[in-house]
Amino acid sequence: MNAIVFKNVKKQLGDFVLDIPHLEIKKGYITGFVGENGAGKTTTIKLLLGMLLPDSGKIEIDGVDVTTHGAEIKKKIGYVGDPTGYPAESKLKDIKRMYAPFYETWDESLFESYTKRFSLKLEAKYGQLSTGQKKQFALVMALAHKPSLIILDEPTSGLDPVVRQEILDVLMEHMQDEEVSVFYSTHITSDIEKAGDYLVYIKNGKIQINQPLNELLENYCIVSGPKNLFTQEIKKELLGYRESKFGVEGLVKSRALAEEIFGREVKYAASSIEDIMVFLSNKGGER
């Protein structure tokens, strides 16, 4: 079963075109969603939330069409974005009182548990909260109605490492107790490496990668060596590369393939999500 499915989806906004012929997001996992600014992450999320409609194609959440069943879909989604838009003068308890009745699945004990976990004072006004506390409260509100899909859009951006880790801990603990899927858009790739199960990478409106994260990090590899080893034919085998006066660094999809090509003549290093993004955005050039 899939949490999210895109089928032949296109959306044009000015000169930008989002083009996703097929995308499946597995149910019950945390899927990291990464890409450069302007790659299409925000457009994708707005389509999922029903804030935009596709020009063509179909989007499903838990097998239900987002376009034709918008009200039903919104009850299935917990959303944490940046910024969160609760009224600044409202107390947290009043915000909860306003929103809870919209959800038949609202769990008051879960709400109380998470607000205590984050030491949030319900008498406090939303506008008085720090950036970190606002993100924590938004996460509590998203989790308390027990959605089947949680969409996170930069939930830890601008937060210190301690608060970021607290948010990740609560998210992962919640997933152990509830049947839920997470679609996690962020530029903080280390958070995805800590918590993610799958990675989706988007570039220029097109999906470039969608695969298990552990498989990706185990297989993708950085090779580095003198320029004379990297002929034009070999460069074609690289997913991306960078040249400098010291030589060439390149990204390969498989260390086994790289060893067949280079043997012991180059250095090998494990790649991170950030490395993969940098090399895929740089198909060749100097630094």
Language model features: what each stretch is:
Residues 75, 81-137:
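ABC-family P-loop ATPase nucleotide-binding domains
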